[in-house]
Amino acid sequence: MRVTVLGAGAFGTALSVALYNSCCSVALWSRNKRVLEELRNTGMNSLYLPGCLVPKEIELIPDVESALKCASVLLLCVPTQELRNLCNDVRNTAALDASVPVLVCSKGIENKSLKFAGEVIEELLPDNPVFVLSGPALAKEMVRGLPCAMVLAGRDESLAASLAEKLSSAVMSIAPSTDYVGVQIGSVLKNIIAIACGIVIGKGLGYNASAMVVVRGIAEIQAVSTAKSESVDLSTIIGLACLGDLVLTCTSASSRNMSFGLAIGKGQDIASRNDSLVEGAESAQSIDRLSNTLGIHLPVCSAIAKLLRGELDTDQVINQLLFA
């Protein structure tokens, strides 16, 4: 199986290595030519995944059209706000066969359209089967060959099962799911909830308070799932894509979202933070707007959105996170 990964950030690079170790033939593309040059010369990606060696057998490709040729599976590993431009590039090359499954690994919501990542891809690549790959998988651990498990969700149950089996390995377990909407909702909201947990811990309020935020956050995932799809798959809520990823993101110092919240809770000025790689910061505003459109109240997500807009201070946010 030839797998093409578009995006050589931390997760795209780590996933490329994990899939290569699963005996896949892997091609990796990046818009950042310096990243590709360093990978080609040293096998390292010091910008996004320092200290980790990438096998020289992974093919490094500088242009999208060449990367798409002969691909049997396409994985998109770029920030959500860059997905539309990338999908337009893919579509304009006309090099992607309509039978090739497209797997999105972005955990966000498009700010302008309020569409989840999979919805953006379905709009721009309507002929290709689209799946969402999500779950508790830190790039730094994946690239070292440590065990992880994820969910592959899509509308085609049999194809999801087939892909999950082919992409899995002895250390990377991928389970198929048909809860295409619920998995995406969980993957987006968990980042916002992680920021909230980081703030609580940073303020010195302890893990009891953090657990309160997690429980409230799960209720908000359920509320959005119900409003978007009129049903809730309990196995998704308590499974890898929601609870599993939520626990990892809310407890790991390696989580950018948790670290972002932690710094805010400790008093660091939000304006001084570079949040370009913090998906939860991007998603908070969009989810706040989406909740208004859906007519639902999400106290945790709303509090983080208002904080980032400068409408609440951290003490007011704590009150809303724990007691509103």
UniProtKB/Swiss-Prot annotation:
Residues annotated for sn-glycerol 3-phosphate binding in this entry: K107, G135, K190, D245, S255, R256, N257
Similarity field: Belongs to the NAD-dependent glycerol-3-phosphate dehydrogenase family.
Entry-linked Pfam families: NAD_Gly3P_dh_C, NAD_Gly3P_dh_N
SS bonds (residue pairs): none
Catalytic activity, reaction form: sn-glycerol 3-phosphate + NAD(+) = dihydroxyacetone phosphate + NADH + H(+); sn-glycerol 3-phosphate + NADP(+) = dihydroxyacetone phosphate + NADPH + H(+)
Catalytic center residues: K190
Keywords on record: Cytoplasm, Lipid biosynthesis, Lipid metabolism, NAD, NADP, Nucleotide-binding, Oxidoreductase, Phospholipid biosynthesis, Phospholipid metabolism
Lineage of the species this protein comes from: Bacteria, Pseudomonadati, Pseudomonadota, Alphaproteobacteria, Rickettsiales
A GO cellular component entry from the record: cytosol
Gene3D superfamilies associated with the record: N-(1-d-carboxylethyl)-l-norvaline Dehydrogenase, domain 2, NAD(P)-binding Rossmann-like Domain
Domain of life: Bacteria
Species name: Anaplasma phagocytophilum (strain HZ)
Role description: Catalyzes the reduction of the glycolytic intermediate dihydroxyacetone phosphate (DHAP) to sn-glycerol 3-phosphate (G3P), the key precursor for phospholipid synthesis.
Annotated localization: Cytoplasm
Protein name, UniProt field: Glycerol-3-phosphate dehydrogenase [NAD(P)+]
An MF annotation (GO) of this entry: glycerol-3-phosphate dehydrogenase [NAD(P)+] activity
EC number(s) stated in the UniProt entry for this protein: 1.1.1.94
Chain residues that bind NADPH: F11, R31, K107, A139, R256, V278, E279
Pathway noted in the entry: Membrane lipid metabolism; glycerophospholipid metabolism
Alphabetized PANTHER family for the sequence: GLYCEROL-3-PHOSPHATE DEHYDROGENASE, GLYCEROL-3-PHOSPHATE DEHYDROGENASE [NAD(+)] 2, CHLOROPLASTIC
Enzyme class: oxidoreductase
One GO-annotated biological process of the protein: phospholipid biosynthetic process
